[in-house]
C-alpha cells in the first residue's frame, strides 16, 4: 500500500495478521526528522516481534555532498510546520542547515534574512532531491528570489562572518538609544541572571524602552521567545532598530 500516516499503517498491519514479515519504506534517514520515530513507537505497542531499522541518506548529507560542503559543524533546525527563531542561529554559526516547508515558510525565511542584513550569506537550496525534478541552487542570498525557497526544500547556509563572541553581555553604548529610558548594564545583568531562563523560555518585557533587556534575554538562548511591549512610538522604533542590529528574531 502507499501510505504515510502512522495510524493507517498500523491499522493495515493489525488487519493482515497473515503476514509474518512486513517492510515499510520511508525516504531519508530514519533518525533525521523522520516519520519512523512515531511509527516505531506505535509498532512497538502492537508488534511483539523484533523491529529492525535501516537508515537511508538524510537530506542534510545529500545536499552537503552535492555542493561539496562538510556538515559536521552545522547547526540543524527544522522550520517544517514549526515557528522557530533562525536569524540569531545563522548569525552565531558558520553553517546552519534548515528544513523548510509549509505555507509561506520559504518566502518568510528569505525575506527575514534580508531584513536582518544577512543578504551576503552563501546559501545552498535543494528541492525534490534525488528525484528527476531535483533542483539545487547555490549563491549569495541577495542574488536569489523568494520563489527559489518554495515548497519542501532543504537549505544549507554558510556564514563566514558569523559572530564568534563568547560573552553574551552588551555594553550600554552599543544600543541605539535616542531619548528613551534604558535599563542600565549592571541592572540588566543581575535581573536576567535571577530569571534563570531555560532554552525554551517565554519572556514579556513590559515597558521595554529601547529593548535592551529584551535583546539581552533573546541573546541568552536562540529559541527563547521575547515579547517587547512599549507604548512610546520612539521606543517602538528603537526596539525594531536594535533587534535588527543585534539580529535577535
Q: Where are the regions that the model predicts?
A:
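Class I S-adenosyl-L-methionine
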Residues: 1-52, 223-226, 230, 241, ...
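A contiguous loop/helix-start segment that scaffolds small-molecule binding in enzyme catalytic cores
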Residues: 3-7, 21-22, 95-180
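Gly/Ser/Thr-rich loops at beta-strand to alpha-helix junctions
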Residues: 27-34, 55-59, 101-105, 210, ...
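Class I SAM-dependent methyltransferase SAM-binding "motif I" and its flanking Rossmann-like core
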Residues: 28-94
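Conserved alpha-helix/loop element of class I SAM-dependent methyltransferases that forms part
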Residues: 184-199
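Conserved class I S-adenosyl-L-methionine
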Residues: 200-209
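Conserved SAM-binding loop of SAM-dependent methyltransferases across substrates and taxa
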Residues: 210-222
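Short alpha-helix immediately C-terminal to the canonical SAM-binding loop
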Residues: 236-237
Amino acid at each position: 500500500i502507499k501510505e504515510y500516516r502512522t495510524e493507517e499503517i498500523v491499522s493495515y498491519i493489525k488487519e493482515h495478521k497473515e503476514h509474518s514479515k512486513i517492510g515499510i519504506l520511508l525516504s531519508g534517514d530514519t533518525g533525521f526528522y523522520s516519520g519512523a520515530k512515531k511509527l516505531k513507537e506505535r509498532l512497538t505497542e502492537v508488534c511483539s516481534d523484533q523491529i529492525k531499522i535501516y537508515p537511508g541518506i538524510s537530506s542534510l548529507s545529500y545536499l552537503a555532498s552535492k555542493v561539496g560542503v562538510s556538515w559536521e559543524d552545522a547547526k540543524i533546525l527544522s522550520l517544517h510546520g514549526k515557528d522557530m527563531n533562525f536569524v540569531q542561529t545563522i548569525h552565531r554559526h558558520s553553517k546552519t542547515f534548515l528544513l523548510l516547508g509549509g505555507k509561506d515558510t520559504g518566502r518568510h525565511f528569505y525575506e527575514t534574512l534580508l531584513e536582518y542584513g544577512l543578504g551576503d550569506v552563501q546559501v545552498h537550496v535543494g528541492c525534490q532531491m534525488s528525484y528527476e525534478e531535483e533542483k539545487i541552487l547555490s549563491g549569495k542570498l541577495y542574488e536569489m528570489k523568494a520563489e527559489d525557497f518554495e515548497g519542501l526544500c532543504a537549505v544549507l547556509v554558510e556564514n563566514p562572518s558569523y559572530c564568534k563572541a563568547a560573552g553574551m553581555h552588551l555594553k550600554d553604548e552599543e544600543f541605539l538609544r535616542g531619548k528613551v529610558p534604558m535599563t542600565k548594564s549592571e541592572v540588566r545583568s543581575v535581573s536576567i541572571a535571577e530569571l534563570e531562563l531555560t532554552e525554551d523560555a517565554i519572556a514579556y518585557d513590559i515597558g521595554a524602552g529601547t529593548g535592551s533587556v529584551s535583546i539581552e534575554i533573546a541573546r541568552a538562548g536562540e529559541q527563547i521567545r521575547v515579547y517587547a511591549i512599549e507604548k512610546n512610538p520612539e521606543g517602538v522604533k528603537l526596539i525594531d532598530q536594535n533587534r535588527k542590529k543585534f539580529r535577535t528574531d
